[in-house]
Amino acid sequence: MEGIFNSKSLYEYLEEQKQAGISKTKEISLYYKATSKSVGDDEYSLRIWLDYIRLLMDGTKDVTEARETFKMIKMRFCKFYNYWEAYVRFEIEAGNGSLCKILQHSIDFVKVKEFTEKKRVLEYLECVMSYARNGEDLSVFCRGPETSFKPGAQVLSPFEARIGEQSKNKVLKKEHEESGPGHRDDGKNLLSRSGRAHLAPDECKENDNKNRAREDGASLSPSFAAKSKNCGATFGTIPIRFEKEDYSQGITMEINAALGRTSPEGSNSSPRSGAVRSRERIIIKGREIEILKQIGKGGSSKVYKVLFGSNVYALKRVELIGDEKMLSSYINEINLLYKFKGTSEIVEIIDHEVGEDYLHILLEYGETDLSKIIRKGGLSMNFIKDVWEQMLLIVKRVHIERIIHCDLKPANFLFVKGRVKLIDFGISKVIRNDTTSILSEEQCGTVNYMSPEAVTQNKSKVARSSDIWSLGCILYEMVHSNPPLHEYPNLIQKIQRLQEYSEFKYTSKNKAAVMVMKECLARDPKKRPTIDNLLNHRFLTGEMCLESLRELVEKILKIDGGDRVDPEHVDRIAEQLHSTHRQDQA
């Protein structure tokens, strides 16, 4: 890359590297270097930046960095229609509640600029604004499968192409209607998946009341409406990011007691955001389930708090539009949940249903998860020890079944009636009976909790010790209120820090806690403790450490007799105290 000095060559080089099947970590590193080069502000450079933003979004649920990157490159690429389309699509998919405000600022900004595509950009922004103000379905502005990139060519965007085709169909339909009843057009191409007509930019406000009236008659919101049959034909070809989300809200009485806080339940999600309105119902396997409210979402899935009979459950609903690898991860998760069904350590699966368009998973309902409790702050050491011990027992249960979870993080530990349980087995790996590790084809997990060996290279060996690292990161976050890599603001820096890792900073005054964290976060996987080692660690058992006793005895003797202290005398006193303590404990 050092010998590349123009944007076209740089873009082509990056595409060649992707075609060669490089790892996600390597790809991120290449794009980070590419965006640092000065190669001009043309469409090739823009495409490189947009691909970089996509990588940032693939690596985290936090949209802050991607949003800041869009703002940073705005002055460089505001003259290109593709910049505005990508930025608006990003804000729509991020669910930004201030979309209208952002659009108005963008329109005002473009109006005072002069560039070739100004008219086209303004028409696009004003049409999105009209849709947003009138509560229209904004999915029409989200890109479909991308075609080959040809800078300089005046190619219609996916939205414009669809709008143009629909406008053409409307004219044809009108001609058929005017020619009499013998000439009928069913008008299928005029409708989106939600059943609403897409209008040309100058028709955005037309017939809005009719559209609303038509929707008000539906028993379920668009997110639960039946999809068109042709959606199945695109399965496996439309790239979409499936995110794993937490699915609980509120804090149980037991957790409140531990934290000394109360937390009221949140209000129902807005139907306009795609959530199901309260008290609506859905039929799964012939059984009626009452929707109480939406409690989580991410990618193509949403999670609802539901009532089935007299019991409350969590219902995960996954829209089956995505690559087959991600669908496979959900099937893997279901199989593993059934494997652990009936165990006290794992959230229980109640039932599931795989339909043509949706996957439903009915799960045990939890009041909150560990990430929410950590964000509240001020955790006592007794609470941390209790949760830590439960987490160790959970992971021990998983490891006994020869399974590496690969994505342990606070959001995946759910509190159910005060007891900690594990959720989300989407990317877990099963170890064969004749091995102690697995060969991972790609990086998996969340960077803040990923072990160095999981991110350093493609096809790296990952063993149970990788989960031990993740547990150490979670303990670090419970003790320090932030994960070990919190001081590094972006994904690239986090990965580079892991690759160059020596040791993290520890500010806790609890020496036993620091000791167990350091042991879990050893760079060499072979030097990390086992689950049994951690369960018997003095951080949990309270057993006095001989080394700590030596330090204490030495300090006392120095106070009493000066700087010169006989090391053998120190050892004898420390060992005697240690032996006495063990006898008292017995």
Curated annotation (Swiss-Prot):
Biased composition annotated in UniProt, kind: Basic and acidic residues: 167-188, 199-217
Record: active site: D407 (proton acceptor)
E.C. number: 2.7.12.2
Region described as Disordered: 167-223
GO BP of this protein: meiotic spindle assembly checkpoint signaling; mitotic spindle assembly checkpoint signaling; nuclear chromosome segregation; protein localization to kinetochore
SUPFAM superfamilies: Protein kinase-like (PK-like)
Cellular component terms per the entry's GO annotation: kinetochore; nucleus
Domain Protein kinase: from-to ranges: 289-540
Positions with a binding annotation for ATP: I295, G296, K297, G298, G299, S300, S301, K302, V303, K316
Name of the top EC class for this enzyme: transferase
Catalytic activity: L-seryl-[protein] + ATP = O-phospho-L-seryl-[protein] + ADP + H(+); L-threonyl-[protein] + ATP = O-phospho-L-threonyl-[protein] + ADP + H(+); L-tyrosyl-[protein] + ATP = O-phospho-L-tyrosyl-[protein] + ADP + H(+)
UniProt keyword annotations, A-Z: ATP-binding, Kinase, Nucleotide-binding, Serine/threonine-protein kinase, Transferase
GO MF annotation list: ATP binding; MAP kinase kinase activity; protein serine kinase activity; protein serine/threonine kinase activity; protein tyrosine kinase activity
Top-level taxon: Eukaryota
A Pfam family hit: Pkinase
Job description of the protein: Involved in mitotic spindle assembly checkpoint signaling, a process that delays anaphase until chromosomes are bioriented on the spindle, and in the repair of incorrect mitotic kinetochore-spindle microtubule attachments.
Family: Belongs to the protein kinase superfamily. Ser/Thr protein kinase family.
Listed name of the protein: Serine/threonine-protein kinase MPS1
Record organism: Encephalitozoon cuniculi (strain GB-M1)
